[in-house]
Amino acid sequence: DEKHNLKIVLASDSIQYISAEENYVRIYYLEHAKARNYVLRSSMKALEELCLENGLVRCHRSYFINPQHIKTLRKEQEGVVYAELDASELQHVPVSKRYLDTVSALL
């Protein structure tokens, strides 16, 4: 967490994506092929360097995503782009125009 009182140890390749929720982040990951999530009191800014060092990329102001788990990028009729992940029970992750080229280049 932000005060370094709590740590969660996950293999970076098990992390599918991270989403921001006010003063918290929710980490979505796979454990023994089952989808799990963990809420941590932290900001996206505080996690950014750690995420980038471990292969996650920012795809939206509120999301980091692991390119290893992206199955496809899909553009909706409204023009919104979503990353579909390889675990079907997880939601689609939005990819903003600002980060679309970066995410696309990693696929």
Which stretches of residues belong to each language-model region?
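Intrinsically disordered, low-complexity acidic/polar segments
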Residues: 36, 49, 92, 102-104
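Conserved binding/recognition cores within well-folded domains
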Residues: 1-87
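A short macromolecule-binding patch
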Residues: 38-42, 92-98
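Primarily interfacial, aromatic-capped hydrophobic alpha-helices that serve as membrane anchors
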Residues: 97-107
